[in-house]
């Protein structure tokens, strides 16, 4: 005849096994849910895509590329005397690096006398300043910029000054040569950053 103590020990071991099993299952389920949630949130982030003439969060009209860059097509209409092009724009929640100034980008800034281009700008496109009749000073912070031959088409550049701050002597010389080909007849100055 077995005693109550002998019956109690196996039951106690059984309860421990059940509890260990439940705890392990709970931990495993929690880990799977956490991993799933992490994977799910990672796939939600929108990717850069090619779009033409879309409105950015700052009101500018831009064209975007799948590599995460953007071309400024038109700044928002303004009567400000000083206009600064943003180095980044956001379209549909995606941030794009502004690298190019497109045709007639400053046509809406008819009163602007000073235009500042960020260090991210790599290209000043054809007819970029066409329509910007009041501009007298252009500040360029880039180290190297390509200038299209018709960038200043229809603009009187004789009284215009371009100030550069990020160029070496060699880069400045090459930049001046490009400006000459583009018909620029104003002054180019190197200024401190």
For the regions a protein language model found, what residue spans apply to each?
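Consensus positions within tandem repeat domains that build extended binding/scaffold surfaces
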Residues: 103-104, 125-128, 150-151
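Bacterial Sec-dependent N-terminal signal peptides
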Residues: 1-19
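Sec-dependent signal peptide cleavage junction
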Residues: 29-48
């Amino acid at each position: 005849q077995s005693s109550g103590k002998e019956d109690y020990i196996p039951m106690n071991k059984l309860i421990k096994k059940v509890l260990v099993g439940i705890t392990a299952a709970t931990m495993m389920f929690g880990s799977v849910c956490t991993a799933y949630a992490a994977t799910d949130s990672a796939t939600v982030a929108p990717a850069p895509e090619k779009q033409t003439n879309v409105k950015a969060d700052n009101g500018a009209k831009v064209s975007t590329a799948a590599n995460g860059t953007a071309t400024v097509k038109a700044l928002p209409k303004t009567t400000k005397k000083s206009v600064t092009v943003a180095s980044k724009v956001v379209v549909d929640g995606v941030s794009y690096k502004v690298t190019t100034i497109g045709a007639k980008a400053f046509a809406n800034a008819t009163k602007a006398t000073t235009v500042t281009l960020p260090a991210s700008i790599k290209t000043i496109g054809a007819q970029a300043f066409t329509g910007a009749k009041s501009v007298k000073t252009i500040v360029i912070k880039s180290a190297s910029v390509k200038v299209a031959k018709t960038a200043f088409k229809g603009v009187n550049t004789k009284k215009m000054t371009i100030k550069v701050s990020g160029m070496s002597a060699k880069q400045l010389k090459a930049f001046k040569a490009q400006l000459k080909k583009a018909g620029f007849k104003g002054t180019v100055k190197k200024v401190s950053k």
